[in-house]
Regions:
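Membrane-proximal intracellular helices of multi-pass ion channels
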Residues: 1-482
């Protein structure tokens, strides 16, 4: 275990977080907030700089990162970044409990959007900005950002990126890893900027436009007002956000291929096709189920499209309380919570690509059982599926079910409502945000017990980091020096 290298990378990350916190500090000056808020951010920035410099002042002699170091770096980085990111909420006493503040910040960085704040109107502008800004930072990955900003990287940095970028497979877009990170972030930030402009054209000010754009880009769902998107009462805003969420749920590699002229290759992506088919099917099924309850078909279609877009991309914005929709519609949405959007996007969930692969593996197994001597080839993207990938997908599903079961058992001990317990785990583990029952769009996670919040925070981190980085922290072999 190269502990010096782990400390060095984490030190760089803490310095990066200090840089990022300058933005909410600036917001506190712009809106003339009291010294309490300016002091909170300034104090945390100084603490981060001190710790960051202490850990990364001198480069380690051995700069190599192996697989386990990559997992440990990713897991510890996200935990520490969330812990320090929670401090402004605690210091300003807007979220007095550290467990609550940690839950809120983990929810932000993991782009989950589950909240313990029942009333956003009492939260300062600087804290609202930081809360939503964590979505933008966590969406593409905090360590991907480190690789993009600090070009010097070790030969094993690919292990870090593999552990943080969502999906069953990973590939570099260009020859250098740091260049790949910069390409991804450029596309990501330009698209976010376009979202801000489009929302401002809809009559929103720069502050609310930025917060909603951050929530859309990171597919996180934190907003600026109580009631999520409903208070805006704007068809234009609804459509911009609904389309935006779908766009950010697409693999960012596809946008890169479009930019370099490989449009046909990009649009023939198998996962993209299934993603759009699933969205269309879900909208149609729910429309058939609830359209009669709306006075306007257009309004019904708008709410349904927005909700499906929000749930499948695990964003969590809402224009309607889908907790009051018929059971069939809620069941469709619950399935979408598990599917998630595309690999290589900012969305959570299992990812469409994994669901496709698992379905093909299941069908192949059935065919093999019917005709034992038959050779069944499983293809994905017109190529035979590698045995290593198949094993990885199967293992992921097994571990996913195991963690989900443990989280459900723990949370169910603290509530007498199974729907609330099940959807709370599904909503946090899949990085969605609101669930059903007492954690639905009209409620918050404030009434959950501290034990539940701690376990759900673990679930959010595990879901965002593809399970294994969080689990490897508990393996004794991880910490042995070889």
């Amino acid at each position: 275990m190269n502990k010096r290298m782990i400390g060095f990378v984490i030190g760089r990350l803490l310095l990066l977080e200090a840089m990022l916190m300058v933005l909410p500090l600036g917001v506190s000056f712009i809106y003339g907030e009291s010294l309490k808020y300016k002091g909170a951010y300034f104090g945390v920035i100084m603490l981060l700089i001190a710790m960051g410099l202490a850990l990364s002042f001198k480069s380690p002699e051995n700069m190599s990162i192996q697989g386990r170091e990559g997992f440990v770096i990713v897991a510890l980085s996200w935990i520490l970044m969330s812990a320090f990111g929670a401090l402004p909420f605690v210091i300003t006493k807007e979220i007095p409990s550290f467990i609550d503040a940690f839950f809120e910040t983990v929810s932000g960085f993991t782009t989950t959007g589950s909240s313990i704040i029942p009333d956003l109107s009492v939260i300062s502008r600087s804290n609202l900005f930081w809360r939503s800004f964590t979505h933008l930072v966590g969406g593409m990955g905090v360590l991907v950002l480190v690789l993009a900003i600090f070009p010097k990287h070790s030969p094993g940095s690919v292990h870090v990126m593999k552990a943080e970028v969502p999906g069953p497979t990973f590939g570099k877009l260009v020859s250098k890893l740091s260049a790949t990170a910069r390409v991804l972030y450029k596309i990501y930030l330009v698209m976010t900027g376009i979202m801000i402009v489009l929302l401002m054209l809809g009559g929103l000010d720069w502050f609310e436009s930025s917060l909603l754009a951050f929530g859309t880009a990171g597919t996180g769902g934190f907003g600026a007002r109580n009631g999520s998107i409903l208070p805006y009462n704007s068809a234009y805003v609804d459509i911009v956000l609904a389309v935006g969420m779908l766009v950010f749920g697409v693999n960012f590699n596809i946008y890169y291929f479009i930019l370099i002229g490989k449009v046909k290759e990009a649009l023939s992506n198998e996962e993209l096709k299934y993603y759009l088919i699933i969205v269309g099917a879900a909208v149609a099924l729910i429309f058939i189920n609830i359209s009669a309850t709306y006075k306007s078909m257009g309004h019904a279609l708008r709410d349904i499209f927005f909700t499906v877009s929000s749930v499948i991309t695990t964003t969590g914005f809402s224009t309607a309380d889908f907790g009051k929709w018929p059971v069939f519609s809620q069941t469709v949405l619950l399935l979408l919570m598990f599917f998630g959007a595309c690999a290589g996007s900012t969305a959570g969930g299992l990812k469409i690509s994994r669901v496709i692969m698992m379905a093909k593996m299941f069908v192949a197994e059935i065919k093999q059982m019917i005709s034992p001597n038959r050779v069944v080839s499983i293809k994905y993207e017109h190529k035979p599926l590698d045995s290593k990938v198949k094993k990885g997908v199967a293992n992921y599903f097994i571990v996913y079910i195991g963690i989900f079961t443990v989280l459900l058992l723990v949370v169910s001990m603290t509530t007498d409502d199974f729907l609330t317990a099940f959807s709370a785990v599904a909503a946090t583990f899949n990085n969605i945000g609101p669930g059903l029952g007492k954690v639905g769009p009209a409620f918050s996670f404030a009434d959950m017990t501290d034990v539940s919040k701690i376990f759900l925070s673990f679930g959010m981190l595990a879901g965002r980091l593809e399970l294994f980085p969080m689990l490897i922290l508990f393996a004794p072999e991880t910490w042995k020096i070889k």
